[in-house]
Amino acid sequence: MDFISNKTPQIEAMLTEIGIQNVEELFKSIPSSLILQAPSVDDGLSEYEGIQLIESLAVRNTFPNLVSYLGAGAYEHHIPALVGAVCSKSEFLTAYTPYQAEASQGMLQIIFEFQSAICALTGMDVANASVYDGASACAEAILMSLRHHKTRRQILLSDSLHPHYKKVIEQYLKSQDCELITVPFLQEGTLDASFLKMYLNDQTAAILLQSPNFFGCIEDVQPITEMAKSQGALTILCANPISYGLLSSAKELGVDIAVGDCQPFGLSLSFGGPYAGYMACKQELMRQLPGRIVGETLDVQGSRGFVLTLQAREQHIRREKATSNICTNQALAALASLVAMLWYGKEGVKELALTNYQRANYLKFHLGKISTINVWNQGASFNEFVVDFKQDSNQVLEFFRLNGIEPGIELKRYYPSLKTCLLIAVTETKNQIQLDQFIKVCKELF
């Protein structure tokens, strides 16, 4: 097999066959400066020695011993055991793209059910089979709006959108003839609607905002969608899918395209991926929707069946005219999210969203009583919120870690002016004792 290296006798036999003395002679036509020098690597270890080495390295990782309040798009949620049990079935784990419908009914049904679940959450008419992640979903939604409004080349982008998402969008749009205008956020972390109104015009293809946004603030979306409609622009809403269990659906808010990351449902943190992004839209935008769409049909015997539909949009049909050049199937990650959604059910998702909301706002409320720090946005937050500790965040992190807590993410990574602020995330995995301990440590800090 080609990935098993040849032993010395085999190498010597091959060199003799072609009439040369050694391997160096085989490559003598290549300048020595271009030949990669073999790295200095120790001899191999036995299996047991290798296990000992890995375990000695793993012991140095103390993070699992900390109570983590990290969030910013990748959240610690409970993952039902059923998710792993279903996703580990070989017919899902190793399945190929279901081009051949008659041989792929199981996978096609899974994707169809995922699309149905996303439509139920968002209230939208159509959803696709997922994209890479929340960032690519945002970027693809912008491309949708540019295709829909062929002559409009302006995009208004909220600065309270996840910074990683903004970077991906900028990369996507580098080759597009369009103008990207960033709409700033107010001091409490919500979108500056007056700035938005100033730049919105008949050249605007779409407004993209996030709610709950990067800072956990719940935006007043409906007035923005109405403002966009007055100029004929589309509204793209990026949202944590769990938040729909508590907040108004995208359809109720008048949104045209709903996007986000499925990570909160059934996907482990996994160092940032792989995740799956969801995309859903109104029916009139359906033919601009990228990626695969599975439809329900009847076979020649009248039995229910599933097929890839509207394939003329896809790159394996139209190449450069396709709605997207995404070619990696995120169906396994989408399956994990689907299983989690079905495990919770409609009422369970509502309860999960309410629990996340209540626990985050409990911690936020009590931290707000500490006069030496400043909690952003006195209104409601979902999952996370910003605290200004009024001292360098490195010192704050060190103190909390000494007390067994990873308190949040330093916002100076993304916003240099916010060097004393942390973004703190609270999910259903944090109990009353842990939240009270966080408050206690925070008081001791000052």
Swiss-Prot record:
Disulfide bonds: none
Catalyzed reactions: N(6)-[(R)-lipoyl]-L-lysyl-[glycine-cleavage complex H protein] + glycine + H(+) = N(6)-[(R)-S(8)-aminomethyldihydrolipoyl]-L-lysyl-[glycine-cleavage complex H protein] + CO2
Pfam families: GDC-P
GO BP annotation list: glycine decarboxylation via glycine cleavage system; nucleoside metabolic process
Its EC number(s): 1.4.4.2
Keywords: Oxidoreductase
One Gene Ontology MF term: glycine dehydrogenase (decarboxylating) activity
Subunit structure, as described in the record: The glycine cleavage system is composed of four proteins: P, T, L and H. In this organism, the P 'protein' is a heterodimer of two subunits.
Cross-referenced NCBIfam families: PRK00451.1
Reported function: The glycine cleavage system catalyzes the degradation of glycine. The P protein binds the alpha-amino group of glycine through its pyridoxal phosphate cofactor; CO(2) is released and the remaining methylamine moiety is then transferred to the lipoamide cofactor of the H protein.
Family according to the record: Belongs to the GcvP family. N-terminal subunit subfamily.
Name of the protein: Probable glycine dehydrogenase (decarboxylating) subunit 1
Organism: Protochlamydia amoebophila (strain UWE25)
